[in-house]
């Protein structure tokens, strides 16, 4: 079931709810506060181990369900990330395929009522999945994740109408299991963090400016007002014996 929780600035619970509409698994992967002060939640709906739907639900700021939409392209469909776009819509990223690893990247654009505008199943090398999304200044959408069946770095860009701009599977010597987050850089280009805890700064053409291993931090990036980068996440000890939670701050080199 979905578990939703809202707190005040001190961490005191304002409201919480458990929500489900099926006898199978339903869970949330991401949520955002919308421009109108309410919330949209996305993830997976009615997962029985073989079939599932991508889900988008909107709640009021008091936790009341406003609407619910599901999307599917094949047996298994899941959303990992949602953004609200400059043109007043939503874009979702995840995968579509089977529950056993034959994945294509999935990108969906909807209007503010969750009604589908376009949906793209994007083929790359091996199984492919989008974990993170960002809207560019030109209004296109970049997805970051994995390709080559969990072994390589994946970037894809679609324009506002869903047309392809690029679709890149970067197969390197070391398995890194894909990107987990992408954010714009105030210095131009984008910062990305991958499963192997490598922070990469690329320019607008996808060319690498710098790449640095940041220890056991691999899930999320923020840029501070002074340009420093903070990366949070976890890693694994030798032999995959269990990870530690880390927070790393660093100053990128001057471009």
Language-model features, listed with the residues they occupy:
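A sequence-level/structural motif corresponding to short, flexible coil/turn segments enriched
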Residues: 1-255
């Amino acid at each position: 079931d979905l578990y939703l929780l809202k707190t005040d600035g001190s961490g005191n619970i304002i409201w919480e709810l458990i929500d489900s509409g099926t006898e199978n698994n339903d869970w949330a992967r991401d949520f955002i506060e919308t421009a109108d002060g309410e919330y949209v939640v996305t993830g997976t709906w009615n997962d029985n181990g073989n079939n599932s739907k991508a889900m988008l639900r909107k709640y009021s700021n008091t936790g009341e369900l406003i609407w619910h939409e599901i999307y599917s392209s094949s047996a298994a469909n899941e959303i990992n990330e949602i953004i609200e776009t400059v043109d007043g819509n939503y874009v979702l990223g995840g995968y579509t395929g089977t529950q056993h690893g034959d994945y294509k990247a999935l990108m969906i654009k909807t209007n503010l009522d969750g009604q589908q505008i376009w949906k793209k199943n994007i083929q790359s090398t091996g199984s492919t999945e989008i974990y993170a999304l960002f809207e560019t200044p030109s209004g296109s959408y970049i997805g970051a994740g994995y390709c080559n069946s969990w072994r390589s770095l994946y970037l894809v860009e679609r324009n506002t109408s869903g047309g392809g701009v690029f679709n890149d599977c970067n197969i390197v010597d070391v398995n890194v299991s894909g990107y987990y987050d992408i954010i714009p850089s105030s210095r131009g280009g984008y910062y990305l963090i991958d499963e192997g805890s490598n922070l990469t700064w690329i320019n607008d053409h996808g060319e690498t400016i710098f790449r640095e291993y940041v220890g056991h931090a691999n899930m999320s990036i923020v840029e501070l007002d002074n340009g420093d980068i903070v990366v949070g996440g976890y890693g694994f000890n030798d032999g995959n014996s269990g990870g530690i939670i880390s927070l790393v701050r660093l100053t990128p080199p001057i471009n």
